[in-house]
Amino acid sequence: MGSVPDPGELTELAQPSFEEFQKQTSLMTSCTLLWQELSDHFTSLEQNLMKKSEALKQMIETLDNQTQTSLESLKRREVTIDHSVEIVAGKVGERARAALESLEKARDGCGDGSNDDSGDVDDEEGLLSALKSLCLKMDARGFWNFVTARKKELENLRSKIPAALVDCVDPAMLVLEAISEVFPVDTRGDKVSNDYGWACVVILESLTPVIVDPVIGKSRLLVTPSVKEKAKEIAETWKKSLEERGRIENVKTPDVHTFLQHLVTFGIVKSEDLALYRKLVVGSAWRKQMPKLAVSVGLGDQMPDMIEELISRGQQLDAVHFTYEVGLVDKFPPVPLLKAYLRDAKKSAASIMEDSSNTGRATHLVARKEQSALKAVLKCIEEYKLEEEFPPENLKKRLDQLEKTKTEKRKPAAVPANKRTRASYNGPMPPAKAGRITNAYVSSFPFIRSPSHSPQYASPAAYPSPPTTVYSNRSPPYPYSPEIIPGSYQGSPIGYPAYNGYCNGPVPAPAPPVYHPHHHQHHQFHHQQHYY
C-alpha cells in the first residue's frame, strides 16, 4: 500500500513557470491600460459636463438679463404710453387747427389763384412751405404730384419731406394714399413709361422718423392699428402680384426696393417670408440701400451665405458693400474681391470682341464697359479708404487713357471740301448743277464735264479721256450718243464761257489730272476708322 502523506508535513511548493509569469505581466499591463483609458474617458466626460454646465449657466444668465430687460422695456412702454399719447394728442390738435387755418386760407385765396401748391418753387423755404401746405390739408394726390414733378430736386425733397410730414394729421395714411397709384400695383396702364419707384422710396424713407415714438424711439411706431392692417394688406397684394409679373426674376428693382422699404417703415416684416426677402435682396443687390434693408428685414444671420452667393454670381463689387455693412471684412477681404471684379470685366469685354461681327461697335462697348468697371472700383476704394491696400494710380491712368481715346474718336475727320475750281482763264465759276452730274466722281480733282453734256459735239476734246482708273471704284461717265439725249443743247448760255477746253479750240487745255491711289485709300481708311 502506498503511503499517505502526512497533512502536517511540509511539502515543497511548485515553482511558477516563465510562461505563467509572462501571462501575469501581460494581464497587469492590459489592466493598467484599460484603467488609464477609463480614467481618461471619465475625465473627458467630467470636463464636457463642466463645460456644458458653464454654458447653461451663461445661457440662464443671458436669458435672465433679457427677461429683465424685456420686463423693464414693457414697464417703460406702459409707463410712457400716457406721456406719448399726451404728446401725440397735443400734436394732433395743433395739426388739426393748422389744417383748418390752411383750408380757410385756401378758400379765401381761391378767387385770385394765390394758393397754387403745384406751381414753381424758387428756393428751399418755398419748397418746404408748399409741402407743409399739402400735408396740412391731407392732399395725398397733390402731394404725390408735387413730389413726382421734382425728381431733379431729390436731395432737397429727401430733407424737407420729413419736416412737412410732421405737420400732417395722419402722416402714415397720407403716405399710403399718396403712393397708391403705383404701389402695390401700378394702376396707370401699360402705356405709361414713367417709373415712380424713386418717389415711393423717398416718401417711405421720410415717413420713418416721423412715426417713431418720441419717448422710446424705433421700438414703438406711432401707427394706428387700422393703418398698420392696411399696410399689411398692401404687402400681401404685392406678393400675390409676383405671379402676374413673371415671378421674382422679372420684377423691376425699384418695385423691390419700394416693397422692402414698405415692410421696414411700417414694421410688418414676417419671419416666414425670409426666403422671399433673401431672393429679392440678392436679385437687386446692386442697389445702394440693399445692404441696410437686408439687415432691417432680418437677414443679418444669413449675410455670410448671401455674400458668398454674390461672389459666385460675379457680383464682387456688391459683395464688398454687403461685407462692410455687417462687419465681415476679415472673412471677405475687399481688395481681392475688387481685383477679381476687374478681371471678370476684362474677360467679359474679351468675349464681346470675339462674338461681335461689328468690330467698331464692339470696341466702343468694350471701352465703355471697362470705364464703368474702373469708375465703380475707384469709387469703392475712395468710399472705404482702401488707398493703402489698393493704390488707385494705375486705375486712374487707365481711365484717363480710355477717356482720351473716346475724345479723339469724337473729333470729326478732315473731309476735303467739294470745291469747284476755276478755269485756267480766270473766268466765272460754272453753274452749281455742274457739281451734280450723274456718275461724276467727287474729289479734290479739277472738275471735268462729261462729253455727253457738252453744248457742241463737232469739236474734239482737247485731250483724250482719262483712263478708267481715274474713277476709283465708281463707274466712268457713259458716253451717251447725241441722238438719244432728249432736248437740244444750244451754245453756252450768256455769262458762262466754254469750260475746261471742251468744244472750244482757243482755250488752252489744262494738264490732265493725276490720280494718287495711295492718298485716296489712306483718306478713305482714316474716315472709316473714325466712324466706327
From Swiss-Prot:
Tissues expressing this chain: Expressed in leaves, shoot apex, flowers and during seed development.
Region (Disordered): 406-432
GO biological process: cell differentiation; flower development
Domain of life according to the entry: Eukaryota
Keyword Ribonucleoprotein found: no
This protein's UniProt keywords: Developmental protein, Differentiation, Flowering
Residue stretches spanning the membrane: none
Pfam families: Frigida (PF07899)
The keyword Magnesium appears for this protein: no
Disulfide bonds: none
InterPro entries given in the database record: Frigida
Family: Belongs to the Frigida family.
Protein's UniProt name: FRIGIDA-like protein 4a
The organism of origin for this protein: Arabidopsis thaliana (Mouse-ear cress)
Lineage, broadest ranks: Eukaryota, Viridiplantae, Streptophyta, Embryophyta, Tracheophyta
